[in-house]
């Protein structure tokens, strides 16, 4: 089976698009992704990436024009019968390594950590889900010694509203999204820097279409 998806992003300054094709190869998946840079000046390798994925185990991405490889490995172990999800990511070109972990205490509570190896970049996050509808996520940035906050609420019909606030940049964000596994998804975002003079919020919109071929 082959699946195709098309993603378009639109904002005041610029617009862009991404198309991908995914093929099932046994218990693995092969994926080719192209951006609009692949076609602007005629067909080219610009914006082309190739990937092989075994869901839940690994993803290997190859950026064709940059000749760069990104490795991602996933694993789950159990501590006191509770899952600890671990992800290891290495970008060869940037020589960066990221370790990410999340510990699911119960369906309503989760602890997460994200650390870039060799730096002070580390974020700690707590996720609380109330009644399966409302989610509250405080996040502590160790390097900046700052807190970020996110609150989201599920609505009828699959819609989701989310508000975020970054204390370091004083950036306030609002997001309305809807995700459908069969047809696709959309997301509309508005952001405003509260540290600057009063300006109209910056608006962006994303939409994704999924097809089975």
Swiss-Prot record:
The chain crosses the membrane at residues 3-12, 18-27, 32-41, 55-63, 70-79, 93-102, 108-117, 122-131, 144-155, 159-167, 170-178, 202-211. The keyword Transport applies. GO terms for biological process: regulation of monoatomic ion transmembrane transport. Residues 13-17, 42-54, 80-92, 118-121, 156-158, 179-201 are chloroplast intermembrane. One of its GO terms (molecular function) is porin activity. Keywords: Chloroplast, Ion transport, Membrane, Plastid, Plastid outer membrane, Porin, Transmembrane, Transmembrane beta strand, Transport. The keyword Glycosyltransferase does not apply. PANTHER family: OUTER ENVELOPE PORE PROTEIN 24A, CHLOROPLASTIC-RELATED. High-conductance voltage-dependent solute channel with a slight selectivity for cations transporting triosephosphates, dicarboxylic acids, ATP, inorganic phosphate (Pi), sugars, and positively or negatively charged amino acids. This is Outer envelope pore protein 24A, chloroplastic. The lineage of its organism: Eukaryota, Viridiplantae, Streptophyta, Embryophyta, Tracheophyta.
């Amino acid at each position: 089976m082959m699946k195709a998806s098309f993603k378009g992003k639109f904002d005041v300054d610029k617009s862009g698009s991404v198309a991908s094709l995914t093929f099932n190869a046994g218990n693995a998946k092969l994926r080719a992704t192209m951006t609009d840079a692949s076609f602007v000046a005629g067909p080219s390798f610009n914006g082309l990436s190739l990937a092989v994925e075994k869901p839940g185990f690994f993803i290997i991405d190859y950026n064709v024009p940059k000749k760069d490889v990104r490795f991602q490995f996933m694993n789950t172990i159990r501590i006191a019968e509770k899952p600890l999800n671990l992800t290891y990511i290495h970008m060869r070109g940037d020589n960066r390594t990221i370790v990410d972990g999340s510990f699911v205490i119960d369906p309503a509570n989760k602890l997460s950590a994200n650390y870039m190896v060799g730096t002070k970049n580390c974020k700690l996050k707590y996720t609380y889900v109330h009644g399966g509808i409302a989610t509250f996520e405080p996040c502590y940035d160790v390097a900046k010694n700052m807190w970020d906050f996110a609150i989201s609420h599920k609505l009828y019909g699959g819609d989701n509203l989310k508000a975020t606030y970054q204390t370091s940049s004083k950036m306030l964000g609002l997001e309305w999204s809807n995700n459908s596994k069969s047809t696709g998804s959309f997301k509309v975002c508005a952001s405003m820097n509260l540290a600057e003079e009063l300006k109209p919020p910056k608006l962006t919109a994303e939409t994704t279409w999924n097809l089975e071929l």
